[in-house]
Structure formats: C-alpha cells, structure tokens
C-alpha cells in the first residue's frame, strides 16, 4: 500500500528546483580514462540514485537498475553501464565536481536562512569528531590508515597471538549540531604517512578541515565544539585565527590546567540551575592557556534518578554564558549519536563499496549529498515531521516508493 503524501511529495520534488541537483550531476566529468566510454554524468546520476536510495552495495544498485528495471525507468535515454563499467566509471569520476555540488547545496541552505536563528542560543555550532568508517585486514588502498592489531589465532591446533596489519578509512567530520537539519559540512581523511606508517595526528587533520570549511562557506559559523583530543596550543590558535570560538572538553591530557582550575574552584561557591530534568552546579574562571585567555568551567550534573557526572570545559570566548557552554558541550554528542550512527547504519558509510582511493572519496561525497538533502527536506522544508508519528527511515522509504512509481519525473524529467 502506498500512502498518498501529496503535499509532502510536492515539497520533495521542489528540492531539485531549489538545489539544482540533477543539473549539476549532468556536469560531472571523468578524469578521462580512455578505456571507459560511458559519460561521467551517467555514472554520477546512477551512483547518486543508489546512494539516495541508501543501497548497501554496488551489486544492489546494478540489480535494481538492470534486473528489476527500477532505476532504468529514471534514465530512459541513457545507456547505464553493467557492473565492471560502472565500477571503473566511479574510479574515474572527478571527486572535486561532486564536492562542489555539496558546497553549493550548503550555500543555498545558508542563502535560504535555514539557520537564521543559529542552533544553540543564537549561535551556529559545528561539531568536529573523527571516526572509522570501515576497515579490512585484506583490502588495502592508497592513503588508508594502517595499524597493528594483535589477534588470537589457532595455528597447528594451538592458540597463538598474531600481530596483523589492519587497514581502515578514518576521517574527521564537521557537522552542524544543536538543531536539525544536522548537515555535514565536510570531512578530511586521517592517513598513514611515510614509509614506516607514521600516523597523522587527528587534531592537525581537524585544523585542515576548519580551514577548508572557512574557505568554502566564509562567515556564519560561530562555534567549533570538540572532544578533549582537540584541546591543544595549535588547535586553539587556529580556531581563533579563523574567526571562530572553540568549546572543547577538558580532560587529563591537559592535567596542569585542570589542577589550576580545581585550586581556584575550591575557593568558590558553586552556582546552580535546573535544565532538562538535571540539577547543574558550576564553577568558572578565566585562565591563561598558551598565551591566550580561556574560560574554564567545571559542571557537576545530577539527573532526576540521582546519577551524577562531572565535566570540565574550555571556552575560547571568555564572555560566553556558562549555561550556553553547557548546552554546546552536550550538543557535541549529536555528531556521534545522530550523525555517525545514521551514516553508518542507515546510509552504509561503514561499508567499503570499492577499495580504491578516488572511488572511496567519490562515494563518500555522494553519501554526504544524499544525507544532507534528506536532512534539509525532512527537518528544513517539511516543518511538521516531528508530529507525523513515523521514523525518519520509514518516512524516507514511503517517499521513495512514490518517487519510483512516478518515475522520478520532477528530478529526471530530461531522461524520463
């Protein structure tokens, strides 16, 4: 049974007019491997459709295209390649062309004042975090992240500890947090560099990502929030130089700062307020941190079941309200709980579609594009999704069913 969501599907169809997705996909080029005869735009549109439908493998995309003829309906005037041609085409796509579509989509959302009121207390907050997307003991690709893992193996009937090399795709992502749509602004890979496999330092990759974001989107972002791994001299300096404020968790990797703060806080009387079924006490003061002033806040939080936790937070904005800092540091979990969880388990970011560096980046950019479009549609353009009584994935599947029945005419009118 197909539910008629006439108003919703009309809004969904308007996305292509707002963000000009298929027109931009038509302009995607290949890197000109002469052995491949299929157009870059055809490969790109087919791959985008597969990612938009959240397909779990290249095999599924090909099966729904050629055997079940579902996607073929969307491209009546184009010859879609079979498996080997499609894979070779993905490897040859220009990833910069796809990245530009992502940037243009986010700029359009900004132009449409999607975040006019910020995401937390009037501030637009971006969370930074690194994660492993997928890994393999067998497959290896250029610039993957390598590490040694000790595993138990049965050899000649005896259990032995064997050290094996593990290859994984590790990236630092930037995502808008505090309020949905929680769109992804970009990512940077953490790689192994040098002949000895020396690993890059995640905060350095985060710095590169911040610079990339500033170059792509300019002004508009107010705060970068991150875990304790990012709290260091270089990161704090770069965040401020790019014109942002940083709100960063403080843990044992900055032991001296914690000890200095604790010494001061013992002499202070705690301030207290209630927020979201929690009683929150806090102490705060301004400290010198690598030639710059920062505000350090200690929170002692007790929930309605009596459970307690203490957290220390650093803010590079010494004038930021302690209640706002608390909201921001808790919003940091959005990128993991909503972002990474959905991307890995619902958008299949944890699956290695093709173990080749350019293909990995092409597919990641396509996953970003499809994820962001759904976020913008559901939480930005619908306005009433929270009152529908349906899960996000259940709703997406309903809309896509209608989309296929209508042969995607509003999106693929030139080929339908």
Per-range role (PLM):
Residues 32-43, 159-164, 304, 353-364:
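Structural motif
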Residues 4-7, 22-26, 63-66, 270-288, ...:
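A short, flexible helix-boundary coil/loop motif
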Residues 150-220:
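Electropositive, glycine- and tryptophan-enriched low-complexity nucleic-acid-binding patches
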Residues 192-299:
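An internal, acidic/charged active-site-proximal segment
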């Amino acid at each position: 049974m197909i539910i008629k969501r006439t108003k919703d599907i009309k809004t969904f169809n308007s996305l292509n007019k707002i963000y000009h997705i298929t027109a931009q996909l038509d302009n995607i080029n290949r890197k000109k491997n002469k052995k491949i005869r299929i157009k870059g735009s055809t490969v790109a549109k087919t791959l985008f459709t597969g990612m938009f439908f959240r397909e779990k493998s290249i095999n599924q995309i090909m099966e729904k295209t050629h055997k079940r003829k579902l996607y073929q309906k969307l491209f009546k005037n184009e010859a879609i390649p079979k498996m080997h041609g499609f894979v070779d085409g993905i490897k040859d796509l220009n990833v910069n062309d796809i990245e530009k579509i992502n940037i243009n989509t986010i700029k359009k959302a900004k132009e449409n004042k999607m975040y006019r009121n910020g995401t937390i207390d009037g501030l637009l907050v971006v969370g930074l975090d690194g994660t492993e997307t997928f890994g393999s003991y067998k497959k290896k690709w250029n610039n993957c992240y390598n590490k040694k893992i000790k595993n138990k193996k049965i050899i000649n009937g005896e259990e032995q500890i064997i050290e094996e090399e593990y290859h994984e795709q590790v990236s630092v992502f930037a995502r808008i947090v505090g309020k949905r749509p929680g769109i992804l602004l970009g990512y940077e890979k953490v790689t192994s560099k040098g002949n000895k496999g020396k690993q890059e330092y995640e905060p350095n990759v985060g710095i590169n990502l911040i610079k990339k974001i500033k170059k792509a989107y300019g002004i508009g972002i107010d705060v970068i929030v991150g875990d304790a791994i990012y709290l260091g001299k270089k990161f704090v300096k770069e965040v401020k130089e790019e014109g942002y404020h940083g709100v960063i968790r403080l843990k044992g990797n900055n032991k001296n700062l914690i000890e200095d703060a604790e010494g001061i806080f013992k002499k202070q009387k705690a301030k207290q307020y209630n927020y979201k079924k929690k009683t929150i006490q806090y102490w705060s003061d301004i400290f010198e941190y690598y030639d710059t002033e920062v505000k350090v806040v200690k929170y002692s939080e007790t929930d309605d079941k009596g459970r307690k936790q203490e957290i220390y937070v650093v803010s590079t904005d010494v004038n930021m309200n302690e209640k706002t800092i608390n909201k921001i540091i808790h919003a940091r979990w959005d990128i993991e709980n909503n972002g990474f969880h959905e991307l890995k388990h619902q958008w299949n970011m944890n699956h290695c579609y093709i173990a080749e560096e350019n293909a990995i980046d092409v597919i990641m950019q396509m996953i970003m594009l499809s994820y962001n479009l759904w976020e913008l549609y559901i939480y930005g353009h619908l306005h009433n999704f929270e009152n529908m009584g349906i899960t996000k994935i259940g709703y997406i599947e309903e809309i896509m069913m209608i989309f296929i029945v209508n042969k995607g005419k509003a999106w693929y009118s030139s080929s339908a």
